[in-house]
Amino acid sequence: MAYTVIRTDLMSGTNQPADLVSLRFYDGEDKQAAVENGVIVKLEGYEDGEREVMKAVAASSTDDLNDCSIVAGVEVMYDERKRNLDEYINEAGQIVRGYIPRSRNMFSVTKEGFVGGTAPSAVGQEVGIGTDGKIDA
C-alpha cells in the first residue's frame, strides 16, 4: 500500500521552530492510531501529563485552520525491506512532528494525500480539508 509523501521545505517550520508541534494521533474512538504524513489534524490541547505532546485527531471541513497542523513525521524506516518514502507511515502511539500552517506557506503531497487519491488537475484550483484529514480538491 502506498502512503502519502509530503514536501515541507517551503513551510515556515523548516526554519522557524515555533511553527512546529509534537503530536500523537488519535482515531475517532479516542485510541492512538497510525497516521500518514500530509494529513491535516486538529490539535486538541496537550495530552494529560505532557508538556510538549499535543493530542491530535483528523481535521474536518468545519475546523478552523488556526487549530490545525499538518503531519510530517521524519521518515525513519526500521524495516530494512522498505526503501521508498511511500512505504512509510507514522505508527500508532508514536510522537510525530506537525507543521502549523501559516499564510504564504506552501507544501506538496503525492496523490495519496487527496481524498480518493485524485489530485487537482487545474492550476490554482482551491482545496480544503476532506475526509479523514486528507485534502479535498
Where are these regions (language model features)?
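Surface-exposed, low-hydrophobicity beta-strand/loop segments enriched in small/polar/acidic residues
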Residues: M1-A137
